[in-house]
Regions:
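Hydrophobic transmembrane alpha-helices and their helix-loop junctions in integral membrane proteins
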Residues: 86-129, 139-460
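Transmembrane helix-loop-helix hairpins at membrane boundaries of multipass inner-membrane proteins
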Residues: 1-6, 13-108, 184-194, 492, ...
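Aromatic-capped, Gly/Pro-kinked transmembrane alpha-helices
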Residues: 486-520, 536-657
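Membrane-interfacial helical/loop segments at transmembrane boundaries in membrane proteins
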Residues: 58-61, 188-192, 399-413, 486-512
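Hydrophobic alpha-helical membrane-insertion segments
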Residues: 34-47, 165-173, 378-390, 468-488
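Hydrophobic alpha-helical transmembrane segments
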Residues: 69-81, 199-211, 415-431, 506-529
Length: 657
């Protein structure tokens, strides 16, 4: 525990940089981000020691409050530490673009944000958890609202604050109900609660609603595509890579420790919420032209996949299947891998914005010639998010699909097989859409010809940003080629034995035999051999290079696929879900042979926002307007309100004493 406290001490030093004089902004920037980097490195090392070295730190208690670390929290602390190191290194270069714009506040809040996430994972009681959870919410709100002079940023930040407050209220109710049926509010005491059936259902609903909101599951995701693009890119990377996973940690803590006897419908709700979130998330990501909103909706998709795997594990355990641990292993492996690849892609998005001054896909094209290193790193991240074999994205999603296969084959019952078939089909659609989404993302951005002048003036990022993206890219490839450490960490976190070999992994349980076998290094060797044979077969072929016939015209950049045009087949196929709003304006006729010019405007409204949240907002506004009539400014009227309230309380007490 001492090493975790050292990490918290580093973060505390970074927080104090907010107090430095205004003239020391640059020094505050370097000190805060360096402190975050070293603190995250210590955190990752301490978590790794606990997971792989068998070192179990003694819990730290004072009064009714406690800090501790077990296997479930250690794997998330490892994830937080690694992501914190990479993003803090990136921030050393990227955050300098905010010099003169509250740079001290940015660095201090950055350290407070990471520190609060670490303390949430170390919390050993409900009150400590909720305290650090609220600090995490406030720090992330301040970071999202850093450019508060922009109206869109202000709106996104306050919508995030309102939504996260609602989620916190639900989590608080779940803790209070569980603690009231226990001998205390420590996690150890709450694990021995005496909740009966109906109260267990209520605790599950509150806990799932609160953590699903923080994780960005549909239909509670509406804050995420607005808050992540509004925040600075290194903040977006950590919010998507780590903060969303802490919601998974909290939900898992409730399910494993406080509600170990799972009801069948709980499992179905978690599974379906994950599957629907995955499908709708990637569908909307395919439609976006803002690079950060693409990645934000991709986070909705991947959190959906993660919760679907968790629901699959729950359903197998509730059905007494021997393979239930496979779902939870897939959950942790994909959560860890998604954290690394999403951190990488948000950093690449920041590099693109830093080099071009824009985040509009429609203005890019040919950036690989101006930003070659960023292009390579974005290519690696795109392969991973598209779940291409030999990347870490494939490892996690492959395990998820294997867990669903095990669900369908090891559990009896037509209803379970129905859920399995529906989930498998929707996850298949999700994978295909994710592939198309990131082919579009990389191709439109880095390939082809420049679509605007901003590409001509683009420049590569500085050494800190490139180094951070390089480290993340290496981790993506390394965890794809050699997934053993990640899988082993997941199994150790779940308290399960593991059978691994030097070339891949064999997940086995007593009495079952090998459940899953995957050997990426052998697959790589096979691909290299096939590639060499292909090269030998074509190296002596006669190749003619010539200009393609262009119908007598010189092609321009406007004749390339646009981001909107690339996604049109998908948009047409799911028109009934997306409800696109098109506006076509015809201009005057400029040339006799080429006809009129036209202006095409497309808007894809969020279906959940339009059908659910906007009507709710109207009702709340109506109620608020009615309540305003009660505020007349009269002291005598307010005294009368108090008297009426007291009378009602007395009557209630007399009737129900």
């Amino acid at each position: 525990m001492e090493m975790f406290l050292v990490a918290v001490g580093f973060y505390g030093i970074g927080v104090l940089t907010m107090l430095l004089p205004h003239g020391m902004q640059r020094a505050a920037h370097w000190l805060a981000n360096s402190a975050a980097l070293f603190g995250s490195a210590v955190c990752a090392y301490a978590a790794g020691l606990q997971l792989f070295g068998g070192v179990s730190p003694a819990p730290l208690t004072w009064g009714s409050y406690s800090l501790g670390c077990d296997g479930w929290s250690a794997v998330f602390l490892l994830l937080t530490g690694i992501a914190g190191v990479v993003t803090s290194l990136y921030a050393l270069g990227y955050a300098r673009s905010y010099e003169g714009s509250r740079l001290r506040l940015l660095g201090g809040m950055w350290c407070l944000f990471i520190m609060s996430m670490v303390l949430v994972l170390l919390a050993g009681d409900a009150f400590s958890f909720l305290l650090f959870w609220e600090i995490m919410a406030v720090a992330s709100f301040m970071l999202v609202n850093h450019e508060s002079e922009k109206r869109a940023t202000w709106n996104a930040a306050y919508q995030y604050l309102v939504m996260t407050s609602v989620g916190t209220a639900a989590i608080m109710i779940a803790f209070l109900l569980t603690g009231s049926a226990s001998e205390g509010f420590s996690f150890a005491a709450m694990s021995k609660n005496t909740l009966d059936g109906s109260w267990q259902h209520l605790v599950f609903v509150c806990a799932f609603a609160g953590f699903a909101l923080k994780a960005g599951l549909v239909p509670l995701h509406v804050w995420l595509p607005k808050a992540h693009p509004a925040a600075p890119c290194h903040v977006s990377a950590l919010m998507s890579g780590v903060m969303l996973k802490i919601a998974l940690y909290g939900f898992g803590r409730f399910m494993f420790s406080f509600l170990p006897a799972w009801n069948y419908w709980w499992c179905v709700v978690v599974l379906l919420a994950g599957v629907v979130s995955a499908f709708l998330g990637v569908l909307y990501a395919q439609m976006e032209t803002d690079i950060k909103r693409v990645l934000a909706y991709s986070s909705v998709e991947n959190m959906g996949v993660i919760f679907a795997a968790f629901g699959c594990g729950m359903l197998m355990k509730a059905s007494d299947s021997s393979f239930y641990m496979l779902g939870f292993v897939a959950t942790l492996v994909h959560a860890f891998n998604h954290s690394i690849m999403k951190v990488l892609m948000f950093m690449c998005a920041g590099s693109i914005m830093h080099g071009t001054g824009s985040k509009n896909l429609e203005l890019f094209g040919g950036l690989a010639r101006k930003m070659p290193y960023t292009a390579v790193f974005a290519f690696v991240g795109s392969l991973a998010l598209a779940a291409i074999p030999l990347t870490n994205g494939f490892t996690g999603e492959w395990l998820v699909l294997q867990s669903f296969i095990s669900l369908g084959t090891s559990c009896a019952g037509q209803d379970i097989r129905l859920w399995t078939a529906v989930s498998f089909i929707m996850l298949g659609f999700t994978g295909a859409l994710a592939l198309g989404c990131f082919v579009r993302f990389f191709g439109i951005t880095f390939l082809g010809r420049a679509r605007s002048e901003i590409v001509e003036h683009a420049h590569e990022s500085d050494k800190f940003m490139l180094a951070a993206m390089g480290v993340a890219s290496v981790l993506v490839v390394a965890c794809g080629l050699y997934p053993l450490p990640v899988v082993r960490a997941a199994l150790l976190a779940l308290g399960m034995p593991v059978a691994l070999d030097a070339f891949g992994m064999n997940l086995a349980w007593a009495g079952i035999g090998t459940a899953v076998c995957y050997k990426p290094l052998l697959l790589l060797a096979l691909l290299l051999v096939l590639g060499a044979l292909l090269w030998l077969s074509v190296k002596d072929c006669f190749i003619v290079e010539d200009v393609t016939w262009n119908c007598g015209t010189y092609p321009t950049q406007r004749q390339q696929y646009s981001a909107t045009g690339f996604s049109k087949p998908v948009r047409r196929a799911f028109d009934y879900l997306l409800k696109p709003k098109r506006q076509v304006t015809y201009m005057r006729k400029e040339h006799a042979y080429f006809g009129r010019q036209l202006s095409y405007k497309l808007e894809i409204p969020d279906m959940i926002t339009e059908k659910l949240y906007q009507p709710l907002q109207k009702h709340f506004v109506s109620i608020s307007n009615f309540l305003r009539r009660l505020q007349q400014g009269s002291v005598r009227l307010y005294v009368a309100y108090v008297m009426v309230a007291m009378m009602l309380v007395l009557v209630w007490g007399a009737l129900y004493k």
